[in-house]
Regions:
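Extended, low-polarity transmembrane helix blocks
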Residues: 2-104, 111-187
Length: 187
């Protein structure tokens, strides 16, 4: 026996269609919000990069690295001593690498270029800055430390973007349309 559809069947189906459209619209808004977050993060990095290109940063890079070691716990002294030796005599190269890396991160975040690769570089670079230039956020002594450093937060933001970035408003979408293999780099 075949059952006939009644008017109530149609009335029940209509809200489901509405809910699906609402979910799609909500997901699109979420993806656009994530893209705006990525772009705003890129603007923050562009300010940071501009500061790294200043002559004072370039000239004082070695002193900046040496200054971080002051007041750190003894068990970390080897870590900072290694970096002082590495940077010693090579400060202009490291200052240039720092400025270039931050400029790349700013550009790539704003444009949405090679997103997965950029986020991986950002995570690693943030951890590097946190452990060397920020001294793991220390020294951790009562009355002297008020936070754990900014670069660790930058790494967490890069990690979050790595996990949820949807690719809206990005140059990667244009490149991937012409070069499908680009999706491996862009996400």
């Amino acid at each position: 026996m075949r059952q006939e559809h009644t008017a109530t069947d149609v009335a029940i189906a209509a809200p489901v269609s509405f809910v699906l459209r609402a979910n799609v619209a909500g997901a699109a808004r979420r993806m656009i919000a994530i893209a705006y977050l990525r772009i705003a993060f890129g603007v923050i990095w562009s300010v940071d990069a501009a500061l790294k290109w200043q002559p004072a940063f370039q000239a004082n890079f070695s002193q900046i690295v040496a200054g971080v070691a002051q007041g750190q716990p003894g068990f970390l002294s080897w870590w900072f001593a290694i970096w002082q030796v590495i940077v010693s005599g090579r400060a202009p190269i490291f200052a240039l690498l720092t400025a270039t890396t931050e400029t790349y991160l700013a550009f790539a975040l704003i444009a949405g270029f090679a997103r997965k690769f950029t986020y991986a570089i950002g995570i690693a670079y943030g951890l590097f800055v946190w452990s060397v230039a920020e001294g793991f956020g220390g020294p951790y002594m009562p009355g002297t430390t008020t936070d754990v450093g900014a670069a660790i937060i930058y790494s967490l933001v890069f990690w979050a973007l790595f996990l949820v970035d949807a690719g809206r408003m990005s140059v990667d979408r244009l490149i991937a349309a012409r070069v499908p293999a680009w999706r491996r780099i862009s996400g």
